[in-house]
């Protein structure tokens, strides 16, 4: 049995994109949600930023198997129309389709960068936007079409142990860059920003490796068998760190 300890650090996830791809994500979709402890904790923190208890139309970008949905349920937030959008069809198959508090649930298989936006009362995204090729454009569209937005975006601190071990740079943006992009895109919003660090501690190195595998990491054709073997045999850490920038904003009237 794997014993995990989730710790939220006082200071202000992301995955290694080089070791994370849609093939691996789809391959491990059925077990991903069982190992997505950090993602769920981040979604819970994000939803606590919301200013209202009732929304007419909500869009969840990069919904995955439903971390934001579950967090909304936990907070008893009422929603008339909820759209869960994700580019992994297998993840969407795991997303809840029934709710006491949400009247209509729609699942949309699409890339959030190609999504045709319309007007939303709330756009939310947790642990997804860090993979945007053109984050500036996505943020500007969210700001234009939403009355309220709540976003959790991973920084380059996430999984730094893995990057340091493999001597690879993180593909993610740093905290300063993310803050600048958000402030520029949401100039017409009253905003709140907070960065949080999370940590997973494992009893054994094998548990840490299994976690990475089950989350779709180190999968696909990114690492060779030899590289994976070297990674496990020489991996010197039993802790994985994550950092997210939490943003919430309401459009000024």
Regions found by a protein language model. Give the residues of each.
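Conserved class I S-adenosyl-L-methionine
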Residues: 2-52, 67, 71, 91
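Conserved Class I S-adenosyl-L-methionine
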Residues: 35-39, 65-67, 170-173, 192-253
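Conserved acidic residues
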Residues: 56, 121, 147
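Class I SAM-dependent methyltransferase SAM/SAH-binding core
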Residues: 59-114
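A short acidic, Gly/Pro-enriched loop at the edge of an enzyme's catalytic core
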Residues: 113-122
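A short SAM/SAH-binding and catalytic strip from SAM-dependent methyltransferases
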Residues: 122-134
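A short glycine-rich, Lys/Arg-flanked "PGG" loop and its adjoining helix->strand segment in the class I
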Residues: 136-149
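Conserved catalytic/acceptor-binding region of the Class I
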Residues: 147-203, 218-223
């Amino acid at each position: 049995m794997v014993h995990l300890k989730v710790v939220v650090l006082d200071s202000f996830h992301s995955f290694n994109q080089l070791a994370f791809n849609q093939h691996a994500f789809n391959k491990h979709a059925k077990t991903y949600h069982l190992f997505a402890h950090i993602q769920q904790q981040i979604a819970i923190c994000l939803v606590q930023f919301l200013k209202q208890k009732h929304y007419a139309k909500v869009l969840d970008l990069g919904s995955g198997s439903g971390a934001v949905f579950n967090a909304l349920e936990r907070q008893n937030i009422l929603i008339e129309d909820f759209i869960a959008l994700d580019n992994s069809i297998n993840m969407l198959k795991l997303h809840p389709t029934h709710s006491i508090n949400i009247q209509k649930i729609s699942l949309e298989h699409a890339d959030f960068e190609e999504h045709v936006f319309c007007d939303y009362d709330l756009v939310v995204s947790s642990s997804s936007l860090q993979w945007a090729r053109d984050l500036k454009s996505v943020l500007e569209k969210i700001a234009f079409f939403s009355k309220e937005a709540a976003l959790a975006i991973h920084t380059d601190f996430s999984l730094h142990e893995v990057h340091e071990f493999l001597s690879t740079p993180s593909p993610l943006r740093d905290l300063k860059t993310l803050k600048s992009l958000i402030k520029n895109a949401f100039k017409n919003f009253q905003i709140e920003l907070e960065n949080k660090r999370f940590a997973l501690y494992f009893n054994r190195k094998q548990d840490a490796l299994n976690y990475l595998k089950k989350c779709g990491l180190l999968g696909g054709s990114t690492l060779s068998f030899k590289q994976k073997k070297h990674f496990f045999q020489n991996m010197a850490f039993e802790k994985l760190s994550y950092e997210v920038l939490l943003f919430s904003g309401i459009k000024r009237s």
